[in-house]
Amino acid sequence: MEIKKVVVGYLEENCYLIKEGNKGLIVDPGDEIDKILNMIGDTDIVGILITHAHFDHIGALDELLKVYDVPIYYHNVNKELNYNKLVDVKEQEYEIDKFLFKVLYTPGHRNDSVTYFIGNNMFTGDFIFRLSIGRTDLEYGSDEEMMESINKIKRYSNNITIYPGHGKDTYLGFELKENSYLQ
């Protein structure tokens, strides 16, 4: 598995391409469709994963769907996204082509926030960042739900790589040790 990242938009959101052979998944197409398409190249996109519906994570979604007619995976609890191929994810495993992934509900930053667990990698959106966590003071945010989500991921292996919605990649073990919000 190969993971590529492009930073997009004025909020510097991380959009990811997860590749297996020539197949790929896109995570959080936030903005700047040209940068995203350049990262994709000739990869055959088979799905789009959305961690939550803030504008900086879905800003290029409509443009991307004009190029790729693929399913969108998202926890549509607030009924904010309305697409024909929307898969309203549950907390379970999914298989798309060559990809097997697990969805974890990780509300706190927003009530629609999910983490995608693929291989030894977590795509956390704005749930966990390197040495920080997502804000809980915005619409649909909750301190209590954030703490429940943090406790949920503590059971996973320390060597899991975290790919956040903003900033640098990190490891779960490092965050559990050094991130004061996870103590």
Please report, for each region that a protein language model flagged, where it lies by residue:
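Pocket-forming structural segment of enzyme catalytic cores
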Residues: 92-93, 99-115
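Metallo-beta-lactamase
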Residues: 24, 111-183
